[in-house]
Amino acid sequence: MEEKYLPELMAEKDSLDPSFTHALRLVNREIEKFQKGEAKDEEKYIDVVINKNMKLGQKVLIPVKQFPKFNFVGKLLGPRGNSLKRLQEETLTKMSILGKGSMRDKAKEEELRKSGEAKYFHLNDDLHVLIEVFAPPAEAYARMGHALEDIKKFLIPDYNDEIRQAQLQELTYLNGGSENADVPVVRGKSTLRTRGVTTPAITRGRGGVTARPVAVGVPRGTPTPRGVLSTRGPVSRGRGLLTPRARGVPPTGYRPPPPPPTQETYGEYDYDDGYSTAYDDQSYDSYDNSYSTPAQSGADYYDYGHGLGEEAYDSYGQEDWTNSRHKAPSARTAKGVYREQPYGRY
């Protein structure tokens, strides 16, 4: 009986007129089930011990009836079909857009639908995405769940979401443009104001005389010891020194000195490289040295640019107490000297 069943189905299919679409659909489905050995409707079991690969398929409906003006097929495919390819690679599944409206040429789609061939039978169904998985049972259902979660993002009728913006950027890149044409990334020397380096600007001072150009500062993160003058460029304002405003206005015939030569080595401290390894190494090394190495003399901490040492401070103190410049300091012991008997009298 089974040997004659398949030839009878094939003969009946050939005798049917193409206008009987539903009859052809039922015959094709029966032929497909018989060829796959699914003629008997028997309950299927999953053997997780052997862990044999199983085939899992699911149809996902595309909401074209609710949103007829939105191009879901174009959003699913993406530029040159790359979006659907990446989605299949990420979920490890096979996806196919099937159903009515899945082909661009509507006339050809109608012709293939009326042809009655089994491979074009899906054109009679609603527009959907067929997800197929071939893997062990647990892995198959995990992949299917991942695919259903990811494909849901493509079925939202939004023209300005992240997926659409990425597709437009990819389309621009494929058409010959740059992938990052909207926001160019340029590392190295930047035209913007750099961090830690002041741009030399010439300003008008009081009396109409041009002031001196601003000195180039030390990059951020590199501390300088107190009392030590920087050798880079002109001397900047420090503690104890008069500000340029307090020095008075220069005479009318005064000419400012030529600006100092610009050092090319400052180019490495621009904004883009501010968080690079060079910046970190210099800043952390300088901080480690300043906290680990003890001070060599008191002038490193107490000399604020006056040019005075420890002797000058000592002589000034003695003159204040003795009220005489030419007498030797008194040999009287200071009160802070250690005594054997703290409560003894003088």
UniProtKB/Swiss-Prot annotation:
Phosphorylated on tyrosine residues. GO terms for biological process: mRNA processing; positive regulation of RNA splicing; regulation of alternative mRNA splicing, via spliceosome; regulation of mRNA splicing, via spliceosome; spermatogenesis. It comes from the Eukaryota. SMART domains: KH. Residues 253-262 have a biased composition (Pro residues). SUPFAM superfamilies: Eukaryotic type KH-domain (KH-domain type I). It is found in: Nucleus. InterPro entries: BBP-like, KH_1_KHDC4/BBP-like, KH_dom, KH_dom_type_1_sf, Qua1_dom, Sam68-YY. Residues 61-127 form the KH domain. Coiled coil: none annotated. Its main location: nucleus. The keyword ATP-binding does not apply. Residues 212-268, 320-346 are annotated as: Disordered. Ubiquitous. Highly expressed in brain, heart, testis and in Sertoli cells at all stages of spermatogenesis. Expressed in neurons. Detected in cortical layers of the forebrain and in the CA1 to CA4 regions of the hippocampus. GO terms for molecular function: identical protein binding; mRNA binding; protein domain specific binding; RNA binding; SH3 domain binding; single-stranded RNA binding. Residues 1-160 are annotated as: Involved in homodimerization. RNA-binding protein that plays a role in the regulation of alternative splicing and influences mRNA splice site selection and exon inclusion. Binds preferentially to the 5'-[AU]UAAA-3' motif in vitro. Binds optimally to RNA containing 5'-[AU]UAA-3' as a bipartite motif spaced by more than 15 nucleotides. Binds poly(A). RNA-binding abilities are down-regulated by tyrosine kinase PTK6. Involved in splice site selection of vascular endothelial growth factor. In vitro regulates CD44 alternative splicing by direct binding to purine-rich exonic enhancer. Belongs to the KHDRBS family. This is KH domain-containing, RNA-binding, signal transduction-associated protein 3. It comes from Rattus norvegicus. The gene is Khdrbs3.
